[in-house]
Swiss-Prot record:
It holds the Pfam family Hpr_kinase_C. NCBIfam families: hpr-ser. The lineage of its organism: Bacteria, Bacillati, Bacillota, Bacilli, Lactobacillales. Residues 264-269 are annotated as: Important for the catalytic mechanism of dephosphorylation. This is HPr kinase/phosphorylase. Residues 201-210 are annotated as: Important for the catalytic mechanism of both phosphorylation and dephosphorylation. The Walker A ATP-binding motif also binds Pi and PPi. Belongs to the HPrK/P family.
Length: 311
């Protein structure tokens, strides 16, 4: 998986100072970024030319302080064929020697008015998400009250129908049938649709529905953090389901675990409302309000009072 230089330009709204069309088609294969400070002093032992080179005020100031011929020579060493692009932050003026070296070495020179630290963070975050390894899972990913909920279950259980009902209730569809999930960092999962399935949902007996066309742009979302997993399964009288919410399960994807709850599907149950309640209950727990703990405390208090009265 790779990202093209032109995609970075479009995402971060960079300005092109120098860049022939073919240079903007160069591939970026690493999310790491280099700020070439030591390299400008002539130390290239651990130089990583395959990364995007980002110059901020410090690097630019040192470069400008150098004699013109020295500036050109050090830039010639930095600009190698495998270098995707060079970005100059803060809207700083690109020296003529840099343009000359870029033309000779065929390297795109880009600029941004953003502060270096902010630009570095945005660039790293974008490349991390684009280059992260994807894991495809079967299910429906919904944005419910701003929280990403992954709905899974056996084939034919009604995942897509539940997703459509949630859309009608004002929530947003992220992905149906196939959800591509990646770890944005060590504790966060994100999900997005396959490009071919974007904004589409399949309903048995009806066919494929374009959710954006039918319900508007507010009914869809391109990606979402995955915070809760819901597993739908047929109701079985011989199986015990969690009734208090104290039997925690987890779903692990790409080394990151998220909580998962199991919801029994039975005639007459409004599953979309149950999932809404599950999402709100999870958010309440994250904010420190735990209904299960409150029930336990009330039950313990009631038992204690009864013991005193019966003593």
């Amino acid at each position: 998986m790779s990202v093209l230089v032109k995609e970075v330009i479009e995402k971060l709204r960079l300005d092109i100072v120098y860049g022939e069309p073919e240079l903007l088609e160069k591939e970026i294969n690493t999310a790491d970024i280099t700020r070439p400070g030591l390299e400008m002093t002539g130390y290239f032992d651990y130089y990583t030319p395959e990364r995007i080179q980002l110059l901020g005020m410090k690097e630019w100031s040192y470069l400008i302080s150098m004699p013109s011929n020295s500036r050109y020579e050090v830039l010639k060493k930095m600009f190698l064929p495998e270098t995707p692009a060079v970005i100059v932050a803060r809207g700083l003026v690109v020296p003529e020697e840099m343009l000359k070296a870029a033309r000779e070495c065929k390297i795109a020179i880009l600029t941004s008015r953003a502060a270096t630290s902010r630009l570095s963070g945005e660039l790293s975050s974008y490349l991390d998400s684009r280059l992260a390894e994807r894991t495809s899972v079967h299910g429906v990913l919904m944005d419910i009250y701003g929280m990403g909920v992954l709905i899974q279950g056996d084939s034919g259980i009604g995942k897509s129908e539940t997703g459509l009902e949630l859309v009608k209730r004002g929530h947003r569809l992220v992905a149906d049938d196939r959800v591509d999930i990646f770890a944005k960092d060590e504790i966060t999962l994100w999900g997005e649709p396959a490009e071919i399935l974007k904004h589409l949902i399949e309903i048995r007996g009806v066919g494929i529905i374009d959710v954006m066309s039918l319900y508007g742009a507010s009914a869809v979302k391109d990606s979402s953090q995955v915070q809760l997993a819901v597993y739908l399964e047929n109701y079985d009288t011989h199986k015990t389901f969690d009734r208090l919410g104290n039997n925690a399960e987890e779903l692990e994807v790409s080394g990151v675990a998220i909580p998962r709850i199991r919801i029994p599907v039975k005639t007459g149950r409004n599953i979309s409302v149950v999932i809404e309640a599950a999402a709100m209950n999870y958010r309440a727990k994250e904010m420190g309000f735990d209904a299960t703990r409150l029930f336990d405390e009330r039950l313990t208090s009631l038992i204690a009072r009864n013991e005193v009265q019966n003593a």
